[in-house]
Amino acid sequence: MTYKGKFHPTNLNKYKGDINNIVYRSLWERKFMVYCDDNDDIVEWGSEELVVPYISPLDGKRHRYFPDFYIKTKNGDKFMVEIKPKKYTKPPRPTKTKRLTKAFMHETTEWARNRAKWSAAQDVCKKHGWKFLIITEDHLKMTKYLYGG
C-alpha cells in the first residue's frame, strides 16, 4: 500500500521551498520529515527541491532526478538524501520463482535507473562539498529510539 499526503511543519523557518506543498510519498518519507522538522541539529531542509540531471542507461537520454531531501546541519554540513526501501538499494537477484519474470525485469531496469541517478547525485555532492545519503527503513527505525518518532 502506498501512503501519500501533505506534511505541515511546525518549524516553518527551517523549510526551504513551498511550505504549502510538502508532499510525502511514503510513511518513511513522512517520518524523515518529522525528524528534520523536530531535530535541532538540522537548521534547513527541503523536500524534492533540488534537480540533478542524469543520463538514463535505459534510453541514453538526459533526465531529471529530484532527490527526496536536502538538509543543512548546524555545523554547516549539507546532505542530499534519498529514502528507499532496503530491498531497492541492492541489485535484484533471480530466484527459483523469479527468473526472467516481468517483475524481475522491472526490478532490473529500476536498479539501473537508480544507480544512474545516485551516481549523478554523488557527483553533484562531491562538486559542492556535500554528502549523498541513501536512507532505508533500518536507519529510520533507529530515529524512533533516538527522537521518539
Walk through the language-model features, giving the residues of each.
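Electrostatic, structured charged patches in enzyme active sites and in nucleic-acid/phosphate-binding
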Residues: M1-G149
